């Protein structure tokens, strides 16, 4: 089986990228791709009454500041399955820090979903949806503080900043 982390980033990158889905929208389970197993495995069950507000995964052939592929949250009409590779239109960036350092999340939409064609930049995402995303990431590790886990959201950035982050992570991956 191919290493999902090294799949192509996509021919239209950085505007449209491939994203490997690890966690479907609505899940209270945190799944992660394990390249040693060649499979997506359960990392943990979120300890609170929380669920992912979008489909969560990573952009292959990228390297973020934390040493992992660049994370992303995808807005979709219907939940996507773990292991699916989806073309995602990059629309914004959520800047965060956690116990490991910088941990930005690309925000995107399914590129081939006409219901989402109107979302081109983070300003097009309804305010309530952005608040839900921010609240999730601010609190999803709160009950794990005794284990040294924490998160701080430092702000939202527009599509231009998100594209710059994707470019930087592609360049870092290439070395």
From Swiss-Prot:
Q: Which EC class is this protein assigned?
A: hydrolase
**Keywords, comma-separated and alphabetical:** Cytoplasm, Hydrolase, Magnesium, Metal-binding
Q: Which reaction does it catalyse?
A: diphosphate + H2O = 2 phosphate + H(+)
Provide the residue positions that the database annotates as binding Mg(2+) 1: 66, 71, 103
Q: State the PROSITE patterns in the record.
A: PPASE (PS00387)
- Please, which domain of life does this record's source organism belong to? Bacteria
Q: State the InterPro entries in the record.
A: Pyrophosphatase, Pyrophosphatase_sf
Q: How does it assemble?
A: Homohexamer.
Q: What is this protein called?
A: Inorganic pyrophosphatase
Which source organism?
Answer: Thermus thermophilus (strain ATCC 27634 / DSM 579 / HB8)
């Amino acid at each position: 089986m191919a290493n999902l982390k090294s799949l192509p980033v996509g021919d239209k990158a950085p505007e449209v990228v491939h994203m490997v889905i690890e966690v479907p929208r609505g899940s209270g389970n945190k799944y992660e791709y394990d390249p040693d197993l060649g499979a997506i495995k359960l990392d943990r069950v979120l300890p609170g009454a929380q669920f992912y507000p979008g489909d969560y995964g990573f952009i292959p052939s990228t390297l973020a500041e934390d040493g992992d592929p660049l994370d992303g949250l995808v807005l979709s009409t219907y939940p996507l399955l773990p292991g699916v590779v989806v073309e995602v239109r990059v629309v914004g960036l959520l800047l965060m820090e956690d116990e490991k350092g910088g941990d930005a999340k690309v925000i995107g939409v399914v590129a081939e979903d006409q219901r989402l064609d109107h979302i081109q930049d983070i300003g097009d995402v309804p305010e309530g949806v952005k608040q839900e995303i921010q609240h999730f990431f601010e609190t999803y590790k709160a009950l794990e503080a005794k284990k040294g886990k924490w998160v701080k959201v430092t702000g939202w950035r527009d599509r231009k900043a998100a594209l710059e982050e994707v470019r930087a992570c592609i360049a870092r991956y290439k070395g």
